Amino acid sequence: LKAAELFGIGIQFMREHVLPTARIHYVYESAGSAPNVVPDFAQVWIVIRDLDREKVAALTDWAREIAEGAALMTETTAEFDLFFGMYDLLPNEPLARLAYDHLIAEPIEWTEEE
């Protein structure tokens, strides 16, 4: 848990030094079950976004280094699972075509107020 807390502190300091386009969010998914017991396991879910893949990859590497530093300070280990890909843009042409065809077939009727 202490490593997870130190990781969170590190991410807060990291946020002060990223571009305004970056978005970094995290939550403690697992952090123990009793207030007076130090858990043997803690888990943090972090989401990093930015304008392009290169920036996200750089921020991800930085966050990993923060996690490794937190683990080093607490004599624990840090493990990483990458659950989502990092895409600049992942277009869905078939869905876009279907949506366009539907909008043409069933035009939206607007009122004067809208």
Give the location of each predicted region.
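Midchain, well-structured core segments that form catalytic/ion-binding scaffolds
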Residues: 1-114
